[in-house]
């Protein structure tokens, strides 16, 4: 600890005579601290109120997310306070964003309950996000020590075992969300599933708010969907599936629906992010016990991940969900209708699919992360994608991904089955070109046009959606330009 810091930090009896101290004088600011391999590290984007010292604001974040309260308390002397205080050890200005700072904060591993996302999030994104001296606060990234990672089960099935169960290798998986997502009867819903699977898709899925409504009870949907899956498997000779959304009001209801899906022979169930971290982990444990693939729809994430100055980055949510144990997560498309900067999305996909993430600031990854043999998490791309973008999707997202063409299947002018066939032919043509060593990225339109010459459904798809793009600036791009630290 340097001399300047010693003069700031009040210790001993003087500390308990002081009443209210600045957080940086209470030990939450330690610029000489070297994080331990066993520390949990969080990176916050801190925007202090006008006139608030950025170091004091960052120290306050460390304090309020660990052991501090607004005044000095005598009971600190009954604990290993030096050990349990979170330590802000670095504060850097955010490039090209005056008034905002990156605060690096280390937390002792003993501050967290093993294997609990609920406990982790209660500390890291709890009361501190309502702290008055802060104009805005965003959790940008986290690093978890291997000792902590090993307390979680990780994805229940994982990419390798999922591909083995489906007997599908060497290409992205194809899916579609049933549209319209609300209003169909169970019988008509099942018809959509059958036609899409028979046409060449691997999966269909419920949407986030397809639960159990007056027009379609969940049990009816499950029965008609699994009848469709079984008929499509018999017709094509391929393993098929449909994501049956078991999201409900209570855990008891969700377990009941999941058990019924299992009884019907489903290989996969689905939940929504909005059910909460404890429910997600509970369903992940159920899925592992029952050999079921678990799909997570990230419904609701945009309320706190999209704004660059306040909230939680989706890269953090992706890390939490890999720990929690889901097998699929929607992670962006780059070219679709939903938020997704190419570099930022690449970072999300690397979090899901790699055994080890090196620090890669250009992708928004501020820390090296070892995943300690946890299974890999299959990212899902959905929202405004179509067959004409197949070369771009393969280039940006790789082959370990589920490409979900909802409107791009069900909106086909020749019908649902034709829409599915168009997507399957486009994918197979692009994979063949890649395997032959062709420059499929630049030759993509030519490859698709050649395939369409002998496939009317693909030709129709290319004609209908050839001019459909979603070229909007992303609101969440990486900030990685090196700058001088204010801690120097």
From Swiss-Prot:
Its EC number is 4.1.1.39. It comes from Bradyrhizobium sp. (strain BTAi1 / ATCC BAA-1182). The gene is cbbL1. The record marks 337 as: Transition state stabilizer. SUPFAM superfamilies: RuBisCo, C-terminal domain (SSF51649), RuBisCO, large subunit, small (N-terminal) domain (SSF54966). Heterohexadecamer of 8 large chains and 8 small chains. The active site is at 179 (proton acceptor), 297 (proton acceptor). This is Ribulose bisphosphate carboxylase large chain 1. One of its GO terms (biological process) is reductive pentose-phosphate cycle. It catalyses: 2 (2R)-3-phosphoglycerate + 2 H(+) = D-ribulose 1,5-bisphosphate + CO2 + H2O; D-ribulose 1,5-bisphosphate + O2 = 2-phosphoglycolate + (2R)-3-phosphoglycerate + 2 H(+). Belongs to the RuBisCO large chain family. Type I subfamily.
